[in-house]
Structure formats: C-alpha cells, structure tokens
Amino acid sequence: MPHFCLVASTSMLSASYDVSQDLSSALYTSSSTYKYESASARIDCLSTTCTQVLKTLEIEHKLSMKVFATLFLLAASATAALAAVPAPNAGCSQPGQYCNGGTFLCCNNRQCNNNVRVPYSVPGYARNPSYAFSRHHGRNGSSQLSMSIWDALEELLVSGGDWVSYNQWAKYEAGARVVGTIHERRGMNEID
C-alpha cells in the first residue's frame, strides 16, 4: 500500500462522555462542505479537499477493555487515491457482494478489498453488505451527502455489537478520497 504524508496528534481526552452525542453534533454546513468539530478532533472537508487529520482516539469499554480507533483522512488526487485501492478481484461481480463468497466486502466499484469486513450485528449490514458504502446519511437538509466516515464511526461506537476490524477502509466523501483505519472490538460507547 502506498505511503502518504499524514499529520496526527496522540492527544487523549481526559473526560468520559457519550460518543453518540459528540458525533451527532457534527455540522453539515452545505451540500458541498462537511465540517466536524469537537474536543477530540476537527475536520473540514470541502468539495475537492479534506484537510486536517484526526487525532488518535483512545476508546475505553465500560468493563475497562481498551481499544484504539485511529482514523486517517487523506486529501489526494484521483490518481493517488486509485493507487491506494486494491486491484480488481474476480470474486467480486458487483458492489455489495462478498469477496469470493466469504465475509469480506466488495466495494469501490467492484473492487475487492480483502481487508474490509462487515459487522453482521448491525441492522442493515447483514441484509445489505453495501449499506456502509451507499447509505445516505443526511443532516440538516444535506441528504445528498453520502454516509461519511464520521457516521460510520458513530455507528461502530454506539452499535453495541461485535465488530471485526476495518483496515484500509476507503470511500469517497464530498469528492475527496478518504482512507481510514478503524480497530474496534466490542460494544464501545465511551471515550476516556
């Protein structure tokens, strides 16, 4: 996988709070601009560029089981973005299917990313594997914006289900390529 220059901070939050409340405060400022701002991170995604990379978040389970969720936002040209996507796989006949009949999700225009798994426990994903990549999740009248990486993180954290890890998670968000890595284990809903 190509290496990109990323800017990140390892600052941690000191107070516990409900992740769902924090993430739901994200603002869609217009149909072409997605803005998220909180005590943990700040991101401005314009129609062609995503600037500012997320801070590393330390997420702690109620039972003191710690996991780490690290999200990287990449602002890249179409050429660089496509270079980060795995080569097409014959096991994917169409988006939304599973690679080679397994548990890995086919995505990114019929390309097979063997590092992406679908969380079966979340309603919608089990019924429709392409749910995470195609669902529209509009707020404040911006329904034309597709589900953002923030919405995916929000659902991951508040689902309470048993998720497997996401690696090289990639999708288009507001015209820019977003590449992220999420590691989560079970039922996270608090940040320490």
Curated annotation (Swiss-Prot):
Disulfide bonds join 45-106, 50-99, 107-112. Induction: Eexpression is low in biofilm, but high in sporulating cultures. Keywords: Disulfide bond. Belongs to the fungal hydrophobin family. Self-assembles to form functional amyloid fibrils called rodlets. Self-assembly into fibrillar rodlets occurs spontaneously at hydrophobic:hydrophilic interfaces and the rodlets further associate laterally to form amphipathic monolayers. Does not have a secretion signal, has an extremely short C3-C4 loop and a very long C-terminal tail (132 residues) after cysteine C8, has an atypical hydrophobicity profile showing a highly hydrophilic C7-C8 region in contrast with class I and class II hydrophobins. Moreover, most importantly, it lacks one cysteine (Cys3 or Cys4, based on the position) of the first of the two CC doublets that define hydrophobins. Aerial growth, conidiation, and dispersal of filamentous fungi in the environment rely upon a capability of their secreting small amphipathic proteins called hydrophobins (HPBs) with low sequence identity. Class I can self-assemble into an outermost layer of rodlet bundles on aerial cell surfaces, conferring cellular hydrophobicity that supports fungal growth, development and dispersal; whereas Class II form highly ordered films at water-air interfaces through intermolecular interactions but contribute nothing to the rodlet structure. This is Hydrophobin-like protein rodD. It comes from Aspergillus fumigatus (strain ATCC MYA-4609 / CBS 101355 / FGSC A1100 / Af293). The lineage of its organism: Eukaryota, Fungi, Dikarya, Ascomycota, Pezizomycotina.
